[in-house]
């Protein structure tokens, strides 16, 4: 939001002729950053394009690309080989819990729900194996390992920071994660179904609504709901496969490449000196139409 606004202001004040491309990383068009003077909006889906049109963004400035991810999320992985490298069982469905974060505060409730889940994991011994990714949080990793050891869990693995997350996701059958735009997009591209854990607000709430309305994810807010959902998925594996199929509607594995190509085309295109977007001016005010979506 800050970058888009500041960059547009700089171009207005200086009159320089450089293209501005906005790439939102959630499934919602926020109210503060869209500005019709931007040259291109690369959005995740048609719903986002629909919110830009009342803001008088011209159709030629809207491109539905999906949300970009790293290139390794486009690769095909040998699941048995990845599992062997990580010492994960071949005969169980892998449930990946993404609990690591640079800022642990947003994950407090998420981790609390996982802690409450741990004593019940014995009930999935014959079906599911759980992989908890603690990231760079050594204290949390130590806590998880101690809990798993005290509970005698044979179907749980705790990992620290994982360099090749795309490979781990591709080797998994289900992910438990928060509803951040980049996280859910990586899961979509890695073709791993999702259980979105925790209450969601702002853009993340829209991410939840988008994914669950399409049947591409399940949403739970408490440890009890999480346990019930896992029992359902363990009993009916077809439900996870259905999420995978429905998620293909939102999957854009080539988004980063498409955005880069669109940006290069803008750079190469001749600039019209008379274009009001490139004229030096102090401010610009315009009044849009009725919003497509209200929240």
Describe each model-derived feature in a short phrase.
Residues 39-102, 135-139:
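A nucleotide-sugar donor-handling region in carbohydrate enzymes
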Residues 1-56, 61-64:
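Active-site and donor-binding regions of nucleotide-sugar-utilizing enzymes
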């Amino acid at each position: 939001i800050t970058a888009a606004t500041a960059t547009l202001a700089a171009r207005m004040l200086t009159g320089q002729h450089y293209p501005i491309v906005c790439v939102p990383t959630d499934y919602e068009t926020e109210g503060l950053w869209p500005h019709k003077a931007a040259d291109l909006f690369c959005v995740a889906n048609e719903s986002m394009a629909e919110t830009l049109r009342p803001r008088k963004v011209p159709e030629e400035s809207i491109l539905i690309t999906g949300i970009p991810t790293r290139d390794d999320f486009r690769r095909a992985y040998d699941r048995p080989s990845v599992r062997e490298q990580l010492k994960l069982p071949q005969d169980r469905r892998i449930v990946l819990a993404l609990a690591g974060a640079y800022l642990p505060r947003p994950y407090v409730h998420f981790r609390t729900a996982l802690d409450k889940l741990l004593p019940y994991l014995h009930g999935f011994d014959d079906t599911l194996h759980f992989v908890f990714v603690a990231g760079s949080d050594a204290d949390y990793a130590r806590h998880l390992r101690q809990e798993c050891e005290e509970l005698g869990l044979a179907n749980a693995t705790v990992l620290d920071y994982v360099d090749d997350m795309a490979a781990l996701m591709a080797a998994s059958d289900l992910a438990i994660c928060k509803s951040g735009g980049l996280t859910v997009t990586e899961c979509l591209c890695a073709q791993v179904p999702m259980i979105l854990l925790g209450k969601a607000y702002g853009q993340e709430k829209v991410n939840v609504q988008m994914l669950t309305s399409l049947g591409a994810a399940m949403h739970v807010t408490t440890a009890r709901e999480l346990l019930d959902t896992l029992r359902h998925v363990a009993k009916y594996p077809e439900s996870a496969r259905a999420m995978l199929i429905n998620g293909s509607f939102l999957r854009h594995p080539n988004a980063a490449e498409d955005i880069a190509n669109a940006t290069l085309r803008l750079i190469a295109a001749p600039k019209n000196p008379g274009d009001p977007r490139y004229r030096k001016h102090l401010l610009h005010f315009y009044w849009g139409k009725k919003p497509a979506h209200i929240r």
